């Protein structure tokens, strides 16, 4: 997302500093549903509290400086998830992507038969996989795990299936769009925070280096 798109989408309505606590309040305008959402970011005790209509996230696990941590040109949602201490919704929901499961099963079978790509497999093997996914699979991660485990065990007599199926299921889970949304907003705020503080006569350096 470009800077211009962020400016059009987000509107800072207030920034308030009380001691070493900084609060940033924003409105978010969404053209897709013609709605406006409210979000509050609170920086306090080297933690970041993100809350509002889009969910709640608390970051702070082993972060050296909360005001600099999220700065940059691209978000790092996977690494930042390790720094999230709490969230109102799962960052990785307990549903799996059926197409991704099928893709990862195909990759595993290719490795099992030591071929470089799926088309090199025997037609009989490809038919077995095709039949398995013809009508879809369970999307709940635990049921999907059991289903794929039994399938690979029965059809391919695979060994060490626990770790194999675990990797398949984990690889097929999609990260929460609300969490990614929050990461984008947090990074945009941190990238602009110093300028906003100057405009409001807030001592930004004091926030970076509290006494």
For each of these PLM feature ranges, what is it?
Residues 1-20, 115-131, 135:
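Eukaryotic non-globular interaction segments with acidic/serine-rich, low-complexity composition
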Residues 1-57:
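Short N-terminal edge-element motif at the start of the domain
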Residues 118-211:
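A eukaryote-biased signal for long
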Residues 71-131:
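An exposed acidic His-Trp-rich patch
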């Amino acid at each position: 997302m470009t800077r211009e798109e962020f400016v059009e989408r987000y509107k800072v309505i207030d920034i308030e500093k009380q001691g070493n606590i900084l609060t940033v309040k924003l409105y978010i305008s969404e053209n897709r549903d013609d709605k406006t959402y409210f979000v509050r970011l609170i920086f306090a005790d080297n933690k970041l509290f993100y809350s509002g209509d889009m969910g709640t996230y608390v970051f702070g696990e082993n972060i050296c400086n909360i005001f600099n941590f999220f700065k940059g040109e691209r978000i790092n949602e996977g690494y930042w998830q390790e720094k999230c201490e709490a969230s109102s919704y799962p960052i990785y929901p307990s549903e799996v992507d059926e197409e991704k499961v099928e893709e990862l099963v195909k990759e595993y079978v290719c490795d099992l038969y030591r071929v470089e790509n799926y088309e090199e497999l025997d037609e009989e093997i490809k038919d077995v996989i095709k039949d398995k996914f013809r009508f879809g699979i369970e999307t709940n991660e635990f049921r999907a795990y059991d289903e794929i485990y039994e399938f690979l065990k029965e059809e391919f007599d695979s060994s060490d299936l626990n770790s194999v199926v675990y990797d398949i299921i984990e690889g097929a889970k999609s990260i929460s769009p609300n969490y990614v949304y929050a990461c984008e907003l947090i990074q945009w705020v941190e990238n602009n925070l110093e300028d906003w503080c100057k405009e409001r006569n807030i001592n930004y350096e004091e926030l970076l280096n509290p006494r």
